[in-house]
UniProtKB/Swiss-Prot annotation:
Changing residue 325 to Q: In GAMOS3; reduced formation of a threonylcarbamoyl group on adenosine at position 37 (t(6)A37) in tRNAs. It comes from Homo sapiens. Belongs to the KAE1 / TsaD family. This is tRNA N6-adenosine threonylcarbamoyltransferase. Gene3D superfamilies: 3.30.420.40. It is linked to Galloway-Mowat syndrome 3: A form of Galloway-Mowat syndrome, a severe renal-neurological disease characterized by early-onset nephrotic syndrome associated with microcephaly, central nervous system abnormalities, developmental delays, and a propensity for seizures. Brain anomalies include gyration defects ranging from lissencephaly to pachygyria and polymicrogyria, and cerebellar hypoplasia. Most patients show facial dysmorphism characterized by a small, narrow forehead, large/floppy ears, deep-set eyes, hypertelorism and micrognathia.
Length: 335
């Protein structure tokens, strides 16, 4: 019964998780929160992660009831992500692996999301909508790879939402996306915004540029409220995501859809995806914020699968890769 300790820190979340044989034993997490109207810089984010990671490690061990002797493998996020935070976490993972004399496994962040989603929901072979601050992809498993059937051709959907939040100076606590979601519930008017889908790919830079350009003028003239803009942006970008997911499901002949990534815990997105799945006679699988948002347990779970399949990351190859494609990884742990 191998137990794996996972470190995640590719963006503004830092987490340490423990997984043993399909059970999440611990999953503490911290978030680097910046003032309204601002984003998070790599150097500042890395300093935050370094300041709290050892406390999180101790918290994870205490919560799991395990000691270093009980851990069989150390997993860490190899990429993709922001360089400085990734490096900070990788250094700690390497150090712990050497101090405890444990094997090390570098995990693709995107695959961590997928494996956690499969574990928690029980989805067997879904078409995956992976939506976060750094990634937007439609993925399906085929011949030992998680194949990307569609993706953003510019910025991620979460990045679009976050940057819009800066325009209105919406709070980043607990996250700009969550606060947009709450404001959107009070929106009454649907403002027409650019809608860009190309096959199974999407583009969000145009809709962001448009809404950045018109937001203050429309608010100043009373054409709409901030809540209306949040509602309109959500409805438009989520409709784009539902469309490309349905197209991928039709292409793959899939009867399951799984939403993963930080944006995936948005209830409105889940509602729209559920409607599409219901009309297709398919099932929707999604998780809550404990497992959708970046966390250490998802890295531990993917690391657990990889460890059991014989994967090991030598110290000489234990760096990070900021641009690490989902389909670069050979998925040897699945049939």
């Amino acid at each position: 019964m191998p137990a794996v300790l996972g470190f995640e820190g590719s963006a503004n979340k830092i987490g340490v998780g423990v997984v043993r044989d399909g059970k999440v034993l611990a999953n503490p997490r911290r978030t680097y929160v910046t003032p309204p109207g601002t984003g998070f810089l790599p150097g500042d984010t890395a300093r935050h992660h370094r300041a709290v990671i050892l406390d999180l490690l101790q918290e994870a061990l205490t919560e799991s009831g395990l000691t270093s002797q009980d851990i069989d493998c150390i997993a860490y996020t190899k990429g993709p992500g922001m360089g400085a935070p990734l490096v900070s976490v990788a250094v700690v993972a390497r150090t712990v692996a050497q101090l405890w004399n444990k094997p090390l496994v570098g995990v693709n962040h995107c695959i961590g999301h997928i494996e956690m989603g499969r574990l928690i929901t029980g989805a067997t072979s879904p078409t995956v909508l992976y939506v976060s601050g750094g990634n937007t992809q439609v993925i399906a498993y085929s011949e030992h790879r998680y194949r990307i059937f569609g993706e953003t051709i510019d910025i991620a959907v979460g990045n679009c939402l976050d940057r819009f939040a800066r325009v209105l100076k919406i709070s980043n606590d607990p996250s700009p996306g969550y606060n947009i979601e709450q404001m959107a519930k009070r929106g009454k008017k649907l403002v027409e915004l650019p809608y860009t889908v190309k096959g199974m790919d999407v583009s969000f830079s145009g809709i962001l540029s448009f809404i950045e350009d018109v937001a203050h003028r429309m608010l100043a003239t009373g054409e709409c409220t901030p809540e209306d803009l949040c509602f309109s942006l959500q409805e438009t970008v989520f409709a784009m995501l539902v469309e490309i997911t349905e197209r991928a499901m039709a292409h793959c002949g899939s009867q399951e859809a799984l939403i993963v990534g930080g944006v995936g815990c948005n209830v409105r997105l889940q509602e729209m995806m559920a409607t599409m799945c219901q009309e297709r006679g398919a099932r929707l699988f999604a998780t809550d914020e404990r497992f959708c948002i970046d966390n250490g347990a998802m890295i531990a779970q993917a690391g657990w699968e990889m460890f059991r399949a014989g994967h090991r990351t030598p110290l000489s190859d234990s760096g990070v890769t900021q641009r690490y494609r989902t389909d670069e990884v050979e998925v040897t742990w699945r049939d």
